[in-house]
Regions:
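Solvent-exposed interaction patches of small proteins and small membrane subunits
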Residues: 1-92
Length: 92
């Protein structure tokens, strides 16, 4: 995944944020916090993971499905953009 090397620091920042969120869930469970608080923390984790997934899928489509040397106005590029939008909305 050569494209991830270029965005590596941005992706690692996301992963570290997710790690912090998961650790917050663990602390909440250990401290026997209210169910609604734990559920909200888990929902935040899920949202963060979905955001990471969307970022990785978009990079994969742009660099492995699309031919980077091909004109940006091609029907393939338009279809790829449409797929990216659909995946992003699904993962929200």
């Amino acid at each position: 995944m050569a494209h991830t090397a270029r965005d590596k620091e941005k992706l690692l920042i996301r992963v570290r944020r997710i790690r912090g969120q998961v650790e917050a869930v663990e602390r909440a469970l250990k401290e026997e916090q209210e169910c609604t608080d734990v559920l909200q923390l888990v929902a935040a984790c899920r949202g963060a993971l979905n955001g990471l997934m969307a970022e990785l899928v978009e990079g994969h489509i742009r660099f492995h499905v699309l031919d980077p040397d091909r004109a940006k106005d091609s029907s393939q590029a338009a279809a790829a953009e449409e797929l990216i939008d659909i995946v992003r909305s699904y993962l929200k």
